[in-house]
Curated annotation (Swiss-Prot):
It comes from Escherichia coli (strain K12). Its EC number is 5.1.1.20. InterPro entries: DgoD-like, Dipeptide_epimerase, Enolase-like_C_sf, Enolase-like_N, Enolase_C-like, Mandel_Rmase/mucon_lact_enz_CS, Mandelate_racemase_C, Mandelate_racemase_N_dom. SUPFAM superfamilies: Enolase C-terminal domain-like (SSF51604), Enolase N-terminal domain-like (SSF54826). Binds 1 Mg(2+) ion per subunit. Its cofactor is Mg(2+). Belongs to the mandelate racemase/muconate lactonizing enzyme family. Gene3D superfamilies: Enolase-like C-terminal domain, Enolase-like, N-terminal domain. This is L-Ala-D/L-Glu epimerase. The lineage of its organism: Bacteria, Pseudomonadati, Pseudomonadota, Gammaproteobacteria, Enterobacterales. Substrate binds at residues 124, 149, 275, 297, 299. It catalyses: L-alanyl-L-glutamate = L-alanyl-D-glutamate.
């Protein structure tokens, strides 16, 4: 018999996380613990209001399948009974973790993947004044970060970006607008970013406005985040985006994430691996995707005042495995 525990946790941040759609001071996560024959498997998710999720709705979704879980629900069956999203993610990752622990293997070994000893991860520069953002970028660079992800909204774009690039002339920069821009003026903004040597622009437009990217000539790659959840989205992204950001909370777990990675690459997309504000538990579950991606943005746990134990080993801009 398999037992199931489901609970919420709130992890305070050491610094407010400010993006185009608001500011957060804590990471709220939902955790699933499965136990079978004395072995425990754990999965974590971060409910996201942008996708119509709350802690309560995700908990309810998880509780709705507890009877099946107790009877031995498999990962394959899970994909059919819950939609992609945070709830399925926590369950899917708990099932993967349980399987790995039962085999006394790491998750990567179970899947047959070799992980690097060190992963270069983006460090996030959150929204602030141009000077604040430049200072943040400079501090991160001096501490060892080589890849910086700059959060922008619809204001002071050139001022912020010029200040940042002046502060860190040699850093690799990617920019995330979190759907805050509009099609009007996008070409000029893309050119500005390209002129500043920005490596990639993530989700400039609201997902429902993606048609504006059709036949849009742009001088740097554009990555789909809010527009890409599962393999079912890929057809609509073709010709509009060059890259997709895979997050387990969007795919509904590692099972669909691995399938999405394979299919996206087969269709010519580059990959980014992202995360929500989360603990090391959530990052550990996503690690098997690392060898396939061009950019890893896994700094969620580094925003926490205290991480879960045992925590992954982060230094500024790097994750050590």
């Amino acid at each position: 018999m398999r037992t199931v525990k489901v609970f919420e946790e709130a992890w305070p941040l050491h610094t407010p996380f400010v993006i185009a759609r608001g500011s957060r001071s804590e990471a709220r996560v939902v955790v699933v613990e499965l136990e079978e024959e004395g072995i425990k498997g754990t999965g974590e998710c971060t409910p996201y209001p942008r996708y119509g999720e709350s802690d309560a709705s995700v908990m309810a979704q998880i509780m709705s399948v507890v009877p099946q879980l107790e009877k031995g629900l498999t990962r394959e069956e899970l994909q059919k009974i819950l939609p992609a999203g945070a709830a399925r993610n926590a369950l899917d990752c708990a099932l993967w973790d349980l399987a790995a622990r039962r085999q006394q293997q790491s998750l990567a070994d179970l899947i047959g993947i070799t992980l690097p000893e060190t992963v270069i991860t983006a460090q996030t520069v959150v929204i602030g004044t141009p000077d604040q953002m430049a200072n943040s970028a400079s501090t991160l660079w001096q501490a060892g970060a080589k890849l910086l992800k700059v959060k922008l909204d619809n204001h002071l774009i050139s001022e912020r970006m010029v200040a940042i690039r002046t502060a860190v002339p040699d850093a690799t920069l990617i920019v995330d607008a979190n759907e805050s821009w509009r099609a009007e003026g996008l070409a000029a903004r893309c050119q500005l970013l390209a002129d500043l040597g920005v490596a990639m622009l993530e989700q400039p437009l609201p997902a429902q406005d993606d048609a504006a990217l059709e036949n849009f000539i742009h001088p740097l790659p554009i990555c789909a985040d809010e527009s890409c959840h599962t393999r079912s989205n890929l057809k609509a992204l073709k010709g509009r985006y060059e890259m997709v950001n895979i997050k387990l909370d969007k795919t509904g777990g590692l099972t669909e994430a691995l399938a999405l990675a394979t299919e996206a690459r087969a269709q010519g997309f580059s990959l980014m691996l992202g995360c929500m504000l989360c603990t090391s538990r959530a990052i550990s579950a996503a690690l098997p995707l690392v060898p396939q991606v061009s950019f890893a943005d896994l700094d969620g746990p580094t925003w926490l005042a205290v991480d879960v134990e045992p925590a992954l080993q982060f230094t500024t801009g790097e994750l050590h495995l």
